[in-house]
Amino acid sequence: MLNIQFLFAKKAKKSYTVVNKLNKQENKMKKYKLQATASFGLEAVVKREIENLGFENISVSDGYVEFTSDLRGIAKANLWLRSADKVLMIIGRFQAVTYEELFDNSYALPWDELIPKDANFIITGKSFKSTLSSVPACQSIVEKAIIKKLQTKYAISHFPKTGVEYTIQAALLKNTVTITLNTSGPSLHKRGYRHGQVIAPLKETMAAGLIQLSYWKKDRIFLDPCCGSGTLPIEAALIGRNIAPGLSRKFAAELWDFIPKEVWQDERKAAYSAIDYDAELTIYGSDINAHPVEIAKQNAENAGVDDSIVFR
């Protein structure tokens, strides 16, 4: 019997149980397991953000925080998480010590309900303290399992991969395999406002995490005397005005068929409505060199918070 946990539920004909079956008419309110990855040391901050967004069944591990949500939560998490790196959708989790087990369990997942026949699906992988230590081999096995599953549904032998991108990760940890879909696309630190940068810039997600660790409040002065390209002051302004950090960018899952377009439209509309345009902020940024300050001013303008920060 396959010892496997699925994200999508239905009663299977075989001896395993699936957790949730995707259905375009019914899947909006179903619960899905999500994983927000984070830089080491920021897990507690990400957990706090997830709690504040109202998500449930939260658990913390090194490098990530897991929680449950409906499909709407995928959009909400991507738009609002400030310190997380990516939001992954957990498709399955199982034990595997042989390539046969890896193939069988990967094949059993509901790829035919997730991936269209023209999908450009990319397999990534990592392995730590696992019997199956060859990452390229694991990637190949998972890809073969997915192709075989899709061949069964679409009755074609060749997949052109000319459509929407689906990045699938097979992560092995102590012989436990977690298969995920990357709903974010590029890392969430890519907010879209940084068009200019300096040497060794601070990642936006790290900056947001540091600000939240400081427990800064918007009614207090914020001063960054070494602001560089302005990441810390800009992130503080976004927090102070309650601006969702992902409003100015797109996400991989926005193009996926099984997530209704109105989910993203509704969550973006709600995020815009939540902005506090009247917040009175006292934020300063300065640097020993004039060039980074000019870059910081432009980045702040791109982020829509240039009227909230004084750069000198």
Predicted regions and their residues:
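Short, positively charged and aromatic/hydrophobic N-terminal segments
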Residues: 3, 7-10, 14-26
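Short boundary motifs at domain starts and secondary-structure transition points
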Residues: 25-27, 113, 273-276
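Non-catalytic nucleic-acid substrate-recognition regions in nucleic-acid-modifying enzymes
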Residues: 30-166
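S-adenosyl-L-methionine
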Residues: 32-42, 46-48, 68-82, 172-217, ...
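Residues at or immediately flanking beta-strands
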Residues: 120-122, 167, 176, 308-310
